[in-house]
């Protein structure tokens, strides 16, 4: 049939296209203009005839017919009467669909305040009127009168009068001398009377004239709201409603159930309440009822409208018949079940199915097995079309019948349809983008989906009953994107870290590991073979074994690209693997001449991908998988109880440690150490013992035993599984055959008595009981952490969703400086690895020769990273998203490599979402990883440095020779570095009080200890000799004798002296006196007085003689808590939320000398006085007040550098940003977050964290507005601020000064430019209230807003379409302009002719 004819019957209206959405307050006129009629009655439908009642909530006259093209009374039916209004029932003949679009309204008999603008904090009405919210509520709910016009009476404007006061005032001043009103009318009139511009002008003047901070804040808040109203064109009185809109009836349906009952939307109940009360109020006013009754009715009307908009926001919740709170309009939007998250962001998808997954080892990497039943259902429309095209059926009905009967020709057609038509598989939870991938379906019998084993890691799938969903991309574009972007073969690398994610695991690894093992004394050792064929023949004949060390000819490509054959040392097993390697200069047999563990295989796949490309990698991965499965099956590796080896020296080690622990108990009994120190030492000793037993066990497992013929025995099967990375870990083996070790209490503390048994020996009852804590905590953690981690991911996605690559290069010269990550002498991440895939921001020079290794603006590849490593470059400045100057989004050069592709990133890549997923995805896995080790405690305390190079030591900073002849570190800026050939290779900062085992200029060997210290106490050390004088150490106030119950030994401990009023001005200290009784002078000229902090244990007494380097007191540090990601996830969240840590560090604001000033109440006063600079200027000193008893890390007279800690602890990120700037903050956040993930062995690229941090730093705070017209203390988006700044400078005004502001991810998400995105995240009511007051416009730039309004997202292929649209729009403008230009001379011509 002709398309035009069809269109008459089914008019398809083109969806209106729009580029932005604006939200604002609706005026009463606007509400009436939307409406199709006033609703006067609370009735819904006639329950006998099921027809809507006239003028009721479902009235057909107002909202439209209930059946297509049919009026209510049935006089006019069918298309031909379209548009006619029936004179009998008044219904327009049109589509029933209009009942979804047409609105009505209710004219209120008395105005009503809109609850959102009244109660949503900060209350907009209260701010407009500059009154407390409580007072406004009293007026609204008819408790008090408010004076609106005082006249000549002494009453004040906005004064509240109770009923009695009002009467009294009327008696006293006369009825007409003043006006006072009550209820919403009063508020409405007051709002009407506000002159926005005048009021704003007055506030500006007051702002300029005030110095008080409180007033400035108050004025600027009110000024903002006034400006918002005047700029958006909203009027304040519109916050009070005189007309209530009624939403279309189809959006609040009434559905008949069987049995004559109805199911209805709660909104109908709420509307009926409003209409009933409104009608009653109208009637009462007509009847001239007494004031008190009318007032009561008005108050009830106000309450019912409140409940309609936001039930429960004020007063008690209105409930329905079944005691359940009614769902109001606000509840429809809010929360997980609200409109935004349930229906707009989380739609259900057609053409999808789900089923259990089973393994498909014979599939290719790009295939999945799809059950025929499912395929038939999913591809129905395609099958119908193909049947029709082939002429096998005439109608759709016929096709349907054929498919339902499963006739033979249908199966052939299904095969045709499915060929080359990819489907998408998804496994919930989809934590990162690899949770949905496309495959080519392969029809299989049965009902389960077959999945390729190698993609399991990406989906985090296993085959213990997991289910997966299948989705069919319908349009050609969707199929194309599925094939080009989502095909499993295009997702070989992980977007989080750029390493292969298609890596063999479990059986495959075991098979390949077994193949690659070489053993001494095997049959056929030393034989030489021509090729693999000959080797296989020999193996079949039993002449040579799989692991024999043989020689064989092998063909590979030389460095110059020539294929050569040469004889190599190998084994038959390794030759089998080598046969699969692709031919390339960089890939030779040397890559597999070792035992292939999981890690090695991963590196092998990485090398193949980097050098031979994607296709070769996919083929290689598939082949290697087949080989691994086959060989693992043939090897038949299994283990029994006797394969678990208990080390011979276990008993000795345990006995030794027991003795040591008893020794510590004795020292504690003798009072040499405190209870806390004893606990720490005992725990430490057992932790070391556990490790020693484990090491012994591993050593025994690795030992190679030979039989009488000199042939090596099979390797232990458990060791093989763990060492290859197939299953199990050293930690698990330790528990099977070593000792289980220390356990943690539920609180996280470590139980002092370890579990000495292992699982093979079996646990005693007490040991079993102790071990249950850990196991139970692990399970409880899992449940809690999964939710936490999911929430973290959601916040991250929300804050970063509009971070998209928008241009190739923003042209900035800024960047950040990267260094290698070194911890305790081990390089954890090399500099080469950190800079890989970035662009250099400046020339990278060889530190020794000064030659340029890599020029600026170069994309750093693997080869360049190797060059940088070889030149021993210490630090490299690279481009980073943090310093990118693109106006919206970021540029490609600042981002660098797209980790999932291994090439520079494309325009349109949604890097923000990828960053969020990369950080959030392991969070969920980590949370689940606590209980795998059964809660065994791991103590993470570092107490020494070792050199990791041979070289020369350089010591800088203050040291003093201690009592035992070693140097003792005396200042906090002491550094120990190791030089190799004059280049600094390592740099350590030993803590205060550490003992240096070397002197400046000593030669050291690799692994030599440089320094050690007690990790459990911080000492206070004297640097001079003399006699101790105790100051202000008053027994019972600042010192208490602590007698240990267990030992009876007394120790003197500094008590908290601030608690008693008499002692509050004490300053407990230890002085060192010279012969003449005066203080000994320190090197910096200060007196040798050492202030004591609360909890310090005194090691010397009054009158004792001390030598330099002697400890005069010890401050115990907290006990060792175990660290697993439980500490980790909340730590990551704390960092991303930019919260102030509790007991945070105090950071010096500038360089200068430290002075202790006069104490203030119970605070210590520390003053930092800057040094006099070259010009003789001296800055203002800065003071800090620090609670007494906190241990201060600096001493009187020390020189301190800006950014150093005065009090140790976790620093507050806001402080770092303020004092040290953006780069220092970025480095701090990246390092801290990486440390948490590194502890769990999860690699994440730094740039993902940087991307999130960039989103947290989007805003600036105005310090001085200059001539920009901005308000001091305001927070603005950077782009908006630059626009204002440029405007002011162009006018010749003074620019504003600003400072960057760090916002936590939740705050940053809520303050995003797009109100749609913010409203769908959290606090929907607040966001929408604010947006409507400001009359905000959403320009639909991010991903989320576009999903919500149902458009293509502006990322990936969508971003390209966006750019095409922009170009087209510009062309349209130009064409229109040209047309206008061409049209201009015409009238003159016409005039001439005339």
Curated annotation (Swiss-Prot):
Question: InterPro entries in the record, alphabetically?
Answer: DNA-dir_RpoC_beta_prime (IPR045867), DNA-dir_RpoC_beta_prime_bact (IPR012754), RNA_pol_asu (IPR000722), RNA_pol_N (IPR006592), RNA_pol_Rpb1_1 (IPR007080), RNA_pol_Rpb1_3 (IPR007066), RNA_pol_Rpb1_3_sf (IPR042102), RNA_pol_Rpb1_4 (IPR007083)
Q: Which SUPFAM superfamilies match?
A: beta and beta-prime subunits of DNA dependent RNA-polymerase
A cellular component term, taken from the record's GO annotations: DNA-directed RNA polymerase complex
Q: Where does Zn(2+) 1 bind?
A: 71, 73, 86, 89
Which parts of the sequence bind Zn(2+) 2?
A: 810, 884, 891, 894
Annotated Mg(2+) binding lies at 462, 464, 466
Q: Which GO terms describe its molecular function?
A: DNA binding; DNA-directed RNA polymerase activity; magnesium ion binding; zinc ion binding
Write the Enzyme Commission number(s) for this entry: 2.7.7.6
A Pfam family hit = RNA_pol_Rpb1_3
Query: What are the boundaries of the signal sequence?
Result: none
Highest taxon of the source?
Bacteria
Q: Which UniProt keywords apply?
A: DNA-directed RNA polymerase, Magnesium, Metal-binding, Nucleotidyltransferase, Transcription, Transferase, Zinc
Q: Which cofactor does it need?
A: Mg(2+); Zn(2+)
The free-text cofactor remark is: Binds 1 Mg(2+) ion per subunit. Binds 2 Zn(2+) ions per subunit.
Which reaction(s) does its UniProt entry say it catalyses? RNA(n) + a ribonucleoside 5'-triphosphate = RNA(n+1) + diphosphate
Q: What class of enzyme is it?
A: transferase
GO biological process terms held by the UniProt record: DNA-templated transcription
Cited function = DNA-dependent RNA polymerase catalyzes the transcription of DNA into RNA using the four ribonucleoside triphosphates as substrates.
The family classification in the record reads:
Belongs to the RNA polymerase beta' chain family.
Subunit description: The RNAP catalytic core consists of 2 alpha, 1 beta, 1 beta' and 1 omega subunit. When a sigma factor is associated with the core the holoenzyme is formed, which can initiate transcription.
Query: What name does this protein carry?
Result: DNA-directed RNA polymerase subunit beta'
Q: Which organism is it from?
A: Caulobacter sp. (strain K31)
